[in-house]
C-alpha cells in the first residue's frame, strides 16, 4: 500500500467514495454503503492523527428544523457505524446543514435523492 495521501486520492480505492446516500426520511444506512463506511473506519483506525467531518444533509421536503435534525441523525448514524468498526470518537466531527446545501437544485425525485446524504470530508 502507498502512503495515506495516495490511498485517499486513488480513484480505485473504496476511500474515493465520500458520499453516503439515504432513503426518504431515513437515517438508516443502506447495505450498499456498508463497505464504504468500513473502509473509512479502517483508514481512521490505521491513521489515528487523521480526522474527518461528517456533513449531514436532507432534501427540501419537511421543515427547516426537521431537516437539520434529520441531517444530524444521518451523520450520527454514520459516526456510530465507524466507531463500531474501530474509528476513534475524537477523529470524527459532525455537522448538519439540513436542506441548506443541496447537491442538486431541482425539485424532483432525482434531485431529492442526491440531497439525502452524508458527505465525508478529510
Where are these regions (language model features)?
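Extracytoplasmic/secreted proteins, especially bacterial periplasmic and envelope-associated proteins
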Residues: 32-39, 65, 69, 73, ...
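Short beta-alpha junctions and helix-cap segments that line functional grooves
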Residues: 105-108
Amino acid at each position: 500500500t502507498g502512503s495515506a495521501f495516495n490511498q485517499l486520492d486513488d480513484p480505485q480505492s473504496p476511500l474515493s467514495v465520500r458520499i453516503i446516500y439515504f432513503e426518504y426520511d431515513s437515517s438508516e444506512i443502506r447495505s450498499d454503503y456498508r463497505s464504504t463506511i468500513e473502509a473509512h473506519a479502517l483508514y481512521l483506525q490505521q491513521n489515528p492523527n487523521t480526522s474527518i467531518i461528517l456533513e449531514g444533509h436532507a432534501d427540501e421536503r419537511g421543515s427547516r428544523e426537521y431537516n437539520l435534525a434529520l441531517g444530524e441523525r444521518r451523520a450520527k448514524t454514520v459516526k456510530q457505524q465507524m466507531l463500531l468498526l474501530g474509528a476513534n470518537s475524537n477523529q470524527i466531527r459532525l455537522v448538519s446543514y439540513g436542506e441548506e446545501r443541496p447537491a442538486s437544485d431541482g425539485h424532483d425525485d432525482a434531485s431529492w435523492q442526491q440531497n439525502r446524504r452524508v458527505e465525508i470530508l478529510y
